[in-house]
Swiss-Prot record:
Residues 549-560 have a biased composition (Low complexity). Expressed in all tissues examined, including heart, liver, lung, kidney, spleen, ovary and testis. GO terms for biological process: RNA polymerase II preinitiation complex assembly. Disulfide bonds: none annotated. This is Transcription initiation factor TFIID subunit 6. InterPro entries: ARM-type_fold, Histone-fold, TAF6, TAF6_C, TAF6_C_sf, TAF_TATA-bd_Histone-like_dom. The keyword Transcription applies. The keyword Transcription regulation applies. GO terms for cellular component: MLL1 complex; SAGA complex; SLIK (SAGA-like) complex; transcription factor TFIID complex. It is found in: Nucleus. Residues 572-587 have a biased composition (Gly residues). It comes from the Eukaryota.
Amino acid sequence: MAEGKKIGNTLLPSESMKVISESVGISQMSEETCQLLAQEVSFRIKEVTQDALKFMHVGKRQKLTPSDIDAALKLKNVEPIYGFHPKEFLPFRYASGGGRELHFYEEKETDLSDIISTPLPRVPLDVSLKAHWLSIEGVQPAIPENPPPVPKEQQKTEATEPLKVAKPGQEEGLPGKGQGSGEGKGKEKKTAILEGAPLKLKPRSIHELSVEQQLYYKEITEACVGSCEAKRAEALQSIATDPGLYQMLPRFSTFISEGVRVNVVQNNLALLIYLMRMVKALMDNPTLYLEKYLHELIPAVMTCIVSRQLCLRPDVDNHWALRDFAARLIAQICKNFSTTTNNIQSRITKTFTKTWVDDRTPWTTRYGSIAGLAELGPDVVKTLIVPRLTVEGERLRSVLDGPVISNIDKIGADHVQSLLLKHSAPVLVKLRSPPDSPDAYRADYGYLGPTLCTHVLKARAQSALQGPQVNRTTLTVTQPRPTLTLSQPSGSLTPSPRTPSIIKVPSSLTLPVQTLMSARPATPTQPSPPPTKYIVVSSAGSSGTQVLTTSSGPSPSTPGVQPIVKLVSGGQSSGVGGSMTGTGGGMQKYIVVSLPPAGESKTPQPSPPPPTTETSTL
């Protein structure tokens, strides 16, 4: 949402392009064409305006005139716009008399009778003293006595358009506003400077922090670079969420910049990581607008990416993680603050590319440059990294397959190769169509071709596996330990004398509980498995025990299955749906069949007698 507002403030709306095109007879223009045309027109207008401002400054004027615009258009070999040159300067009126020429502001005449007849204002209230809380547990209460926090939109306006936030009398007091007196003062100043008089400069105004803010700044900075991880986490959380850090933002920016400058010289990897985490916390704070401080933050982050050495032992310490983290930070900065006016992303991309293509660049700096380019998006990888895979592969071959010159160079080459394969494979999956052969990749990309082909094949396989899973219903089956309890309904069974059994016979039949949880209410595409059968064999032997055999098929995949209990006797038996007759002397089988709903007509087949290997004695 914030990015949309930012782009809307710097570009002409696409609706204007449609209206202009319709006025010249072009009625059908796509939205994409209008947006591209709006970007181009905005860029040209800004370019002409900047050139006109240069002519204004050369002419030592404080206001932009149509002649400056005409001069800028002539500089671009464009015909100037005619008919907008006034005969007199509009804010001033001209008068002459007594041999003098005067230019003055036209003021409205005020009648004294109107002033006399105006009723007097109300008498102000008497002076009184009132106490209020400045802060409660570190949080400023929202009361009329306390100043409201500076909103992020105002910070952005102050950073991009400082003239809009100037006080009403401040702009008028600037030198050179009046024509009559400005020329004389300008000549006097030039004469005084030429004679060697000291040049008077406007003193800088330094904003002073309160005692509480100074204490907070001291505690936060010490905790962020200290040895206690718990305090560091709390400090970073405070920086990322506190809405009252606007006044301390210049101090934090300077602290990070100076800290990186000192610790890079001392090769202190830990403190550099802590400082980059501070940058991440500042960027995560939604109430801070960092554009006015990018001139200090961007060099600090870029130093952690492309510096030659960040630690004392480059072959052991993991400085590669710091370079990756800083590369992600610089990509986020480009995403949030790059516009067609400042061109932050294009300038950073040019810096990374210039460092990477240099043959004298060490492997650590080369790794950082590639990581920074890769984090800027797949378009940058496609345009800048993929065309140089052949050249970079030959450089890697000379280090990895050649004589070992330095262990540090070999480790750096390994990391560069892994980084190139990691970021190039997803892009090549979209650029190249299958089949992928190592010979074709070797011909196109040289030394990295076969390994790159392997990574592309893995990426295609992963995308093929992940593709069907998007529309596939996920079934999670939770099946606790099965418990079978036998019951004898009254009136359905003929009582018979039974021997004592160790199986307890309650008054209900409990089947295994199966819970099906689906990611969305849809019918699974897999075919339904066959019905589940539970066979319970009960026999009365001389030992006074019963044999219980359970044979289970695949668990049902659809809810709503109604079980049917069928009892079969060893001698003669007849029973359907729970009714049966039998004698106590023969062998009995309890068959529990789980069938699908009534809509599907399937006749379950009786299960064969269970094998002896599945018989367990309870």
